[in-house]
């Protein structure tokens, strides 16, 4: 890496959205849905220069004639051909760069299978010919973005939620807990409870409307039972939302019933611990000497932690689970939707990080297994 002027690229591939941009920037340049769409019928759009696949926003806007697929499920890449299309789109259409001219920092889910990191490494060097690359664990990058190296990160996105204890920059794999309950499930649940109110949302297009309602109007109640009582006795919590066709719908207790599932997964018919318990359980799996540092540095990250009221509720729930004298601090940075990306941007622009990159030469000498030695 002789030439220091070459900007590294940072790509955070989430289950729902892909965030991409340049190291040193304070926000990603490109944020688009992690979807690949293929035409349902051959030759519907003859003469329109029909492509065999569409990625991101273009796939979203043409979804009526396409079959949409998410190549990342629960944070983990399951379809590599489509993943390659997303990366190609990221470099050439969104960032408009030549990947062979820039080091690339990618992110991965905690507990990502070893074969997956090797596959990512191989694709970067062999398909995109990058000069250097690195794979960072998402939760660790979020922690860096908050200015810490020790803490526990509750990272909740569209496809998966993880509680990840981190000590001096290293994720502690034995204590990481995964919860397959995230934004997509909350959108589905909101669709279901709005149906009970007499509104029907079923298609994928309507699902996007519900996701928008969720993002604009939902919040987490500090005391769920009390909030339910308030909602029943007055209309003070009701809000209206205008649908694209001009119809106006009113939503009341659905506003907080939907995200309550994060704390009570039984609402979704799931028998798992809520986000507060899984964070507590992850702390309890750590050495007793570092727990104090984890309680005092509990960092929220990802789009599904963006609900108003979530930090106060976490504080209340963890306080009731933890020893009574313990100091508990929930950190909820306003930019937490992008904190994984921001952490990657910070890391890739540090002068001390420059020797951490896996170079093309090292890859050629050692093969994809080098990723386990250099990225941990």
Curated annotation (Swiss-Prot):
Range of residues in the leader sequence: none
InterPro entries referenced in this protein's UniProt entry, alphabetically: Actin, Actin/actin-like_CS, Actin_CS, ATPase_NBD
Domain of life of the source: Eukaryota
Disulfide bonds listed in the record: none
Catalytic activity, reaction form: ATP + H2O = ADP + phosphate + H(+)
Entry EC number(s): 3.6.4.-
Main location: cytoplasm
Compartments reported by the entry: Cytoplasm, Cytoskeleton
EC top class named in words: hydrolase
GO molecular function: ATP binding; hydrolase activity
Pfam families: Actin (PF00022)
Cellular component terms (Gene Ontology): cytoplasm; cytoskeleton
Family: Belongs to the actin family.
Job description of the protein: Actins are highly conserved proteins that are involved in various types of cell motility and are ubiquitously expressed in all eukaryotic cells.
Protein name: Actin-2
Species lineage: Eukaryota, Metazoa, Spiralia, Lophotrochozoa, Platyhelminthes
Gene for this chain: ACT2
């Amino acid at each position: 890496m002789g030439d220091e002027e070459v900007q590294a690229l940072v790509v955070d591939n989430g289950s729902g959205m892909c965030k991409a941009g340049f190291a040193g920037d304070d926000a990603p340049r490109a944020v688009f849905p992690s979807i690949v769409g293929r035409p349902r019928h051959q030759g519907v759009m003859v003469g329109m220069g029909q492509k065999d696949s569409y990625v991101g926003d273009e796939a979203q806007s043409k979804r009526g004639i396409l079959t949409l697929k998410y190549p990342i499920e629960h944070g983990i890449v399951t379809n590599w051909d489509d993943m390659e299309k997303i990366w190609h789109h990221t470099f050439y259409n969104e960032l408009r760069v030549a990947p062979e001219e820039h080091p690339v920092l990618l992110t991965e889910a905690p507990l990502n299978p070893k074969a997956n990191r090797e596959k990512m490494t191989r694709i970067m060097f062999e398909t995109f010919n990058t000069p250097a690359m690195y794979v960072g664990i998402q939760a660790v990058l979020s922690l860096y973005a908050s200015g810490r190296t020790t803490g526990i990160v509750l990272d909740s996105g569209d496809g998966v939620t993880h509680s990840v204890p981190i000590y001096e920059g290293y994720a502690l794999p034995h204590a990481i807990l995964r919860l397959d309950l995230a934004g997509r499930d909350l959108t589905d649940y909101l669709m279901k409870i709005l149906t009970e109110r007499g509104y029907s949302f079923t298609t994928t297009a309507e699902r996007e409307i519900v996701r928008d309602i969720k993002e604009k109007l939902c919040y987490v109640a500090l005391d769920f039972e009390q909030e339910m009582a308030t909602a029943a006795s007055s209309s003070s919590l009701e809000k209206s939302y205008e649908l694209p066709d001009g119809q106006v719908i009113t939503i009341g207790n659905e506003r907080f019933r939907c995200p309550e599932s994060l704390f009570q997964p039984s609402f979704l018919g799931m028998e798992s611990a809520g986000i507060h318990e899984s964070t507590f359980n992850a702390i309890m799996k750590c050495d007793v000497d570092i727990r104090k540092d984890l309680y005092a540095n509990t960092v929220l990250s990802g789009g599904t932690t963006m609900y108003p009221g979530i930090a106060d509720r976490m504080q209340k729930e963890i306080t009731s689970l933890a020893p009574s004298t313990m100091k508990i601090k929930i950190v909820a940075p306003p930019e937490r939707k992008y904190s994984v990306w921001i952490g990657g941007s910070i890391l890739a622009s540090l002068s001390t990080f420059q020797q951490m990159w896996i170079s093309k030469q090292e890859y050629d000498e050692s093969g994809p297994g080098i990723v386990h030695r250099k990225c941990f």
